[in-house]
């Protein structure tokens, strides 16, 4: 993070987006906030019948509670022309088996963002949702099947473009996914979990 901040001449702050007190204290020195990108989160989880309440709460806290924590701390510092961008997931529309908490948390994020938009539009504050399909990150390595995925840079490009949209344009959501057919089809990603299961099957 330090290297990335140095490269673009930015300052970074480490804060827990699921802890109201520590997060509010971390951004306290900031006088105004023009753009908030909620990209904190966790995948994890398991089948509902196997999941403990502690596992459920960990995912909900990271992905959904953090929406409230971040918004409640940042909103007083935002003015007309500023905006929120929430990074959601296609799991909010197409729930993932064995990812009940994750799917529920992302659906909740979308509902939170839409309700927030109804509240802050009169203040000239925009709210956008970026909903990507699979993204090639470390979190994807625990998925037990291969798939086409987009890159983190694809999501970042969408976020950067959204910040250029005129405030008079209402753009609630952008959905991103990898092209699966034709000359621009993405090469399938084979997560580590696929290799682990294949190796285990060979041994047995």
Give the positions of each predicted feature.
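Active-site-adjacent segment of SDR/Rossmann-fold oxidoreductases
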Residues: 94, 115-125
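C-terminal helical subdomain
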Residues: 129, 144-189
């Amino acid at each position: 993070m330090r290297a990335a901040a140095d490269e673009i001449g930015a300052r970074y702050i480490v804060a827990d987006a699921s802890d109201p007190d520590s997060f509010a204290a971390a951004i306290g020195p900031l006088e105004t906030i023009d753009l908030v990108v909620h990209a904190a989160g966790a995948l994890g989880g398991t089948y509902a019948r196997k999941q403990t309440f502690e596992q459920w709460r960990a995912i909900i806290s990271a992905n959904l509670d953090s929406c409230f924590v971040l918004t409640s701390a940042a909103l007083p510092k935002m003015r007309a022309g500023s905006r929120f961008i929430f990074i959601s997931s296609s799991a909010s529309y197409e729930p993932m088996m064995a990812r009940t908490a994750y799917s529920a948390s992302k659906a909740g994020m979308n509902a939170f963002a839409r309700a927030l938009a109804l509240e802050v539009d009169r203040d000239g504050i925009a709210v956008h949702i970026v909903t990507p399909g699979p993204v090639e990150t470390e979190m994807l390595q625990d998925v037990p099947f291969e798939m086409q995925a987009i890159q983190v840079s694809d999501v970042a490009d969408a976020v950067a473009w959204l910040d250029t949209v005129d405030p008079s344009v209402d753009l609630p959501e952008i959905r991103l996914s990898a092209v699966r057919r034709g000359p621009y089809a993405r090469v399938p990603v084979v997560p580590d979990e696929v290799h682990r299961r294949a190796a285990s099957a060979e041994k047995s």
